[in-house]
Amino acid sequence: MTDRIAAVKTYLLDLQDRICAALEAEDGKARFAEDAWERPAGGGGRTRVIGDGALIEKGGVNFSHVFGDSLPPSASAHRPELAGRGFQALGVSLVIHPENPHVPTSHANVRFFCAEKEGEEPVWWFGGGFDLTPYYAHEEDCVHWHRVARDACAPFGADVYPRYKEWCDRYFHLKHRNEPRGIGGLFFDDLNQWDFDTCFAFIRAIGDAYIDAYLPIVQRRKHTPFDERQREFQAYRRGRYVEFNLVFDRGTLFGLQSGGRTESILMSLPPQVRWGYDWKPEPGSEEARLTEYFLADRDWLAGQP
C-alpha cells in the first residue's frame, strides 16, 4: 500500500494548495496562515486558517496524515473486525464561514483510511463529500450546487449521485432538532466497492468539484447588502452548525478520540454564534422561509437539465 498511500498524499497536498489559492483570490484581502504540526503518537499535518477578510470571516483548509497502532472507537465501532489493526488516515477537510449572511457556509472533506495487520490483506476505504449551509437561501444556488455534485458523480454511474445525495441528507441531520443542517450535497464513507484506482479517481473528482460548486455562488452573493438583523439570524443558525459538529460529526469524534490536534479539529466552528431560548422566526419572513422551504429533503434537480 505504500505507493498508493503516497499517491493519495500527493493529491491531497495539491488539493489543499489549489483550494487555498482559489479562496484567497476570491477574498482579495485575507491570506491563509499555515501551521505545520506533528502528532506525538504518529503523523502530522498542515493547518491553514484564514479570517477577517473581505469575504471570509473565518475559515480553514486542513491536511492531516496520522497513523497509529489501533483504530479509535469512532472508526472501529461499525467495523469491529478492524479492532487492533494499525491504521493510517489521510485527508483534507475544510469549512468556510463568510461574513455576509447571503453567502452560505460550505464544508468539504476527502479522506482515505487504511487498516493493516501483519500477515493479512490491508483493509482500505475512502470517504468524503461536500455540503452547503445557507442562511438566506436562493433556489438557483441550491440547483447549481447539486448539479455540480451530480456531474462529478456521473462518470461513475447514474446511481451514484442519488445514493450519496440521500446519504448526505441523512448524515447532516440534527436528530434533537429534527431538521437538516443545510441543503446537502454529497456524503459517502467506506468506499471500496470499486477497485482502488476507480475509488481514487472518484475522490479526485469530488475534491476537484468543490471550487466549481462553491465559487459561483460566492460571486453571486458576496456583494449583497446586509444588516444587523440578518447577521443575528446568521449567528443563530450557526448555532445549529456547532451543535452538529460537536455532537454528531464522525470526523470530529475520530480526531478527538485518536489524539488529533484539537485546534485543527475545532477549526470548523464559526467565530460568532448565538442561542436564543425557543426563538422562532416571524411567519412569512425570509428567515422562516429557510426552514419552511429550503431545509427539507428535496430533489433540487427535478426537471433540471
Curated annotation (Swiss-Prot):
UniProt-listed GO biological process terms: protoporphyrinogen IX biosynthetic process
Protein's organism: Pseudomonas aeruginosa (strain ATCC 15692 / DSM 22644 / CIP 104116 / JCM 14847 / LMG 12228 / 1C / PRS 101 / PAO1)
Known pathway: Porphyrin-containing compound metabolism; protoporphyrin-IX biosynthesis; protoporphyrinogen-IX from coproporphyrinogen-III (O2 route): step 1/1
Binding-site residues, a divalent metal cation: H97, H107, H146, H176
Catalytic activity: coproporphyrinogen III + O2 + 2 H(+) = protoporphyrinogen IX + 2 CO2 + 2 H2O
Chief location category: cytoplasm
Lineage start: Bacteria, Pseudomonadati, Pseudomonadota, Gammaproteobacteria, Pseudomonadales
Keywords: Cytoplasm, Heme biosynthesis, Metal-binding, Oxidoreductase, Porphyrin biosynthesis
Superkingdom field: Bacteria
Keyword Zinc on entry: no
Disulphide-bridged cysteine pairs: none
Cofactor needs: a divalent metal cation
Pfam families listed in its UniProt record: Coprogen_oxidas
Start and end residues of each stretch annotated as Important for dimerization: 241-276
Localization of this protein: Cytoplasm
Name this polypeptide is given: Oxygen-dependent coproporphyrinogen-III oxidase
Role: Involved in the heme biosynthesis. Catalyzes the aerobic oxidative decarboxylation of propionate groups of rings A and B of coproporphyrinogen-III to yield the vinyl groups in protoporphyrinogen-IX.
